[in-house]
């Protein structure tokens, strides 16, 4: 029988969670990781090979170590089981035995990527020295410091180079890899750079080596295997005289408790305790208290806020028992704060300071078993819980889910409550409605035993109204005293509904409670003054209205009953009206009932529509406190009636009565619409406040992007961060004209593009996803190229739908000289953009430019070049687009054009063929006078553009061939006050420059002389004629080249039999030489094109345009008249 052969161990390619310790005496000065035998064999499968191994390591337990770092790995058989040792001279010299982190994640690395580009920064003196050495010598110095060969230097972004006092500030395509001679190495000066976390440039956290650490006591004793140790009867703290310690209060996030303490590594003795009683402190605080991590302490609160010198009676202070845990070192938390959850702080009044004292009975014999909470807090025998009235708790479709979540909340742990405490329970409203529609709506009363957790998006509130205790002969609960709810002993009764508003202590907001439960984030709409302009003024206006309305309603001395009705309107969709209302409701703790008019509308019956509204709203308005009733798309319920019909609008009448009824009961009624003019006059008159919401301005877009890009994660919880070279200012400028919803789409699309980019890199380098992600620190990093691609995709896909303007790609080089014209344009456009402060004191801006002259002289292209040169968005408006058969709609179209431009500023509005848009008033034959009204509206909008407020960043450019037909009012100062004549080139040198600009991408024959070609052209050629000349010359060259190739093919086929003759395609695929496909434009091609070209403007017509010019510029000097058209025809496209 053959012997058994042991199968080789397959390497484990997934991340491994294991124990870590810091080497206290690294003697070689190098950074690497030692793996014990079990870990090494698990991830690599072979202990006998001598290959150089690498791992990516992330330390767990401290916010200072949030990224993976790449290390060389070695085998160390003497290490304890399932553990590794980190050799880091920098961390060891700073922390030594104070380093208390115990857990890490190890990602095995099968291949380290070679870096294509690395940027290093050095001090000024070192920079000058490095300039004199070669790249090879620099690599040798770095390799010597790293203990590796010059061809494979392991380098990480933010690494500090001790020998040269330099720093690695950028790496591509990933943040960590091999630096070699093939790497593009860029050296910069270190001026203005700041080191952050792990040396991160401009980071938000300090370097871990710079964080002061206090000497900790044993942070957790339950998992150290000390159960067999015994002490004598004398407590280890018996000789300490411990006084109450005064601490400030900090907010505790649930993730902070799980990630930054050792509670998960401890025993399961805390699994059933209420995590709302868990507090976190720095280890130095535990030492002062004489406590271990996990001990019970007593906090005392006082409302006077006098601190340690408080003169209040100590017996009057409220005493509360909590359990305290130590934060792992190193960390950047405040050592003078006690971190508690905002839910618990709200229940005790959110004191500014507390007095913390160790319980005297804690560990009396020095044992290592934490005392139980039941020894200090009594168990309640019965508890009565009432629902707090809200649109959620009053909704029958959500009843089963929020009661199920309430039951789970109390059964999962032994909760600690006090009388009159308010308890929030997260609920997924989408899941609740789905369960109701699946079971109850179909008549099935049986509910599923196991309910999915879902993704909570709202809070259902409950209140402890009454109860009895097991002791004291079943007396009622005492206010302010703690009680434990033991599911096995306590009887819980859910009964009644209370209409109270959930009270919050000073310093705690409803938004902080949402953040604690990790509910969907809401944009805060900050009101900031940026460049002398307030951001989100409409949000501030809505805040003031809602605040005053609730304050008057809550004022018991006020006899007035204010009926508050607000209309939110916008010209664009998806600008965030509903998001704004939700945020304002959250800020004020109001009960928001949000309805969609299209869901309520019944076209066949007004009574059924009103009945549906009442069925959803009556109980909420009657039972809840601080109600906001919000109806979206209110124009669907209150359309403006046809004036030709005599039928009364009963829907509007009934809706108006409903609005009066609800507002008289104290509710705030808010409606929103995208077309305020479509609402009936009756309902429109009911709204006392009309707030217009515009597309976000550039500062507002930056704030929105900042919020969207903060703390991003993918669906699998992978962190997403910005690369340091991403500029939010640039993104805000590039996203001009886009709404908040569009920005959300752009960010999501950018993340998708970044993931696809990394997936392509993973396939190309044959590295799995986990390893590649660890090379970027375990994060997906968004680059400027990702955002540029996403924004361009958004504009290409949705430009027609959202009316988003684009920045054209026409440069000054495409247009040509125009020195005088450029100077005029710089004075008009560049000055307000670069120095807006000059116009902040009422000075009017000259924002109108009029190009006129013969057709084909590049007026349109010049306008596009303005937009490109100054990075402005570009709106092109044709005259017929503004005309509409309905009275008032043409003027409204003009208003919409200028409003879109204001939304997309900085922006250029270009009116092509302006004489068709704004002809002289009184000369038109239309019976309705629509053209006259368009001119009047255009004049009013132009005046608004030149004003100091609202028109900044919007420039108007017009083009016409007939300025004599324009209304004279358009040409006065402040409107189109800059008139620039674009004529034809009057010298052969200028014509040669035109041809040179047009042919700069051509392949010209060496014998071609553009000056001689220009000398053969008449002075009646416009820019469009020269474009036609060059295009025809290229076409002639292509025809000539094709003929020559056809001749070669015929000659080749002459000596071949009929069946062996080749085709043109075969010739180009197999036989043709490079010169056969090269198109060279020769002088004969230009000559032929010139002979066939007919000038677009005759000499008589040019004379007419010159006479028109003299009429408009008669007061100008002859020199200016001749310099304006210089080079005006240097274009590459028709007008």
Curated annotation (Swiss-Prot):
It is an enzyme of class 3 (hydrolase). ATP binds at residues 853-860. The lineage of its organism: Eukaryota, Fungi, Dikarya, Ascomycota, Saccharomycotina. Its main location: cytoplasm. It catalyses: ATP + H2O = ADP + phosphate + H(+). Pfam families: AAA (PF00004), PEX6_4th (PF23315). One of its GO terms (biological process) is protein import into peroxisome matrix. It comes from Pichia angusta. This is Peroxisomal ATPase PEX6. Component of the PEX1-PEX6 AAA ATPase complex, a protein dislocase complex that mediates the ATP-dependent extraction of the PEX5 receptor from peroxisomal membranes, an essential step for PEX5 recycling. Specifically recognizes PEX5 monoubiquitinated at 'Cys-6', and pulls it out of the peroxisome lumen through the PEX2-PEX10-PEX12 retrotranslocation channel. Extraction by the PEX1-PEX6 AAA ATPase complex is accompanied by unfolding of the TPR repeats and release of bound cargo from PEX5. One of its GO terms (cellular component) is cytosol. The keyword Nucleotide-binding applies. It is found in: Cytoplasm, Cytosol; Peroxisome membrane. Belongs to the AAA ATPase family. Keywords: ATP-binding, Cytoplasm, Hydrolase, Membrane, Nucleotide-binding, Peroxisome, Peroxisome biogenesis. GO terms for molecular function: ATP binding; ATP hydrolysis activity. It comes from the Eukaryota. Its EC number is 3.6.4.-. Interacts with PEX1; forming the PEX1-PEX6 AAA ATPase complex, which is composed of a heterohexamer formed by a trimer of PEX1-PEX6 dimers. It is a peripheral membrane protein.
